[in-house]
Amino acid sequence: MLTTIAIQIPDGSAIFVLLTFILLMFILKKLAWGPITKIMDARANQINDDLDSAAKSKNEAKKLQTVADTNLKESQSQATALMENARKSSEEQSKKIVDLAQAHADSINRQAQIDARQIKDDALDSAKDEIADLSVSIASRIIGKEITASKHKALIDDFISELEKQQENSPVKEKS
């Protein structure tokens, strides 16, 4: 169809159409091409700015994630340290309580042993005195005369000492 139109147009009008077309392009370039390219450039700039902004936001998010991860690790480390310190503190406290209880038990045991020895010594002294008095009484009746208490006590002390030595040498010993 164009070929038929071009064939029918005389040569002079082809030049006119060509000049009109060139003039139309020039007018379009002056009036419409500038604003269109400005709009296209503005849109391209907007897209580039949006891409840059997205990249910056992504980098900022990565930095924030890194900071958050670091803070989380530090918090976990601090929590672990606090738990370890609490465990050590409780173990130390427990050991102190056990040591204090053991020391108290040892003190009570020592005091009980001292009291038992004192009771034993008091009983032996009392028995010695009673035996001495009884012996003096029996001996004075048998002999018919009185032995002085100091001489008799010395005899009894010697006798008891020998009994204690024999008891120490015997296979059955007291438990203290």
UniProtKB/Swiss-Prot annotation:
Q: What is its main location?
A: membrane
User: Where would you find this protein in the cell?
Assistant: Cell membrane
What this chain does, per the record?
Answer: F(1)F(0) ATP synthase produces ATP from ADP in the presence of a proton or sodium gradient. F-type ATPases consist of two structural domains, F(1) containing the extramembraneous catalytic core and F(0) containing the membrane proton channel, linked together by a central stalk and a peripheral stalk. During catalysis, ATP synthesis in the catalytic domain of F(1) is coupled via a rotary mechanism of the central stalk subunits to proton translocation.
NCBIfam families reported for this sequence: ATP_synt_b
Q: Where is this region: Disordered?
A: 75-94
User: Flavoprotein: is it a keyword of this entry?
Assistant: no
- Gene3D superfamilies, per the entry: 6.10.250.1580
Phylogenetic classification of the source organism: Bacteria, Bacillati, Bacillota, Bacilli, Lactobacillales
**Gene designation:** atpF
Q: Which residues form the signal peptide?
A: none
Which topology term describes how it sits in the membrane? Answer: Single-pass membrane protein
Keywords (A to Z) from UniProt: ATP synthesis, Cell membrane, CF(0), Hydrogen ion transport, Ion transport, Membrane, Transmembrane, Transmembrane helix, Transport
Q: Name one GO molecular function term.
A: proton-transporting ATP synthase activity, rotational mechanism
Q: Which residues cross the membrane?
A: 7-27
Basic and acidic residues bias spans: 85-94
Q: Does the keyword Cell membrane apply?
A: yes
Q: What is this protein called?
A: ATP synthase subunit b
Cellular component terms per the entry's GO annotation:
plasma membrane; proton-transporting ATP synthase complex
**Coiled-coil region list:** none
The entry describes its oligomerization and partners as:
F-type ATPases have 2 components, F(1) - the catalytic core - and F(0) - the membrane proton channel. F(1) has five subunits: alpha(3), beta(3), gamma(1), delta(1), epsilon(1). F(0) has three main subunits: a(1), b(2) and c(10-14). The alpha and beta chains form an alternating ring which encloses part of the gamma chain. F(1) is attached to F(0) by a central stalk formed by the gamma and epsilon chains, while a peripheral stalk is formed by the delta and b chains.
Matching entries from InterPro entries are given as: ATP_synth_b/b'su_bac/chlpt, ATP_synth_F0_bsu_bac, ATP_synthase_B_chain
- Family per similarity comment: Belongs to the ATPase B chain family.
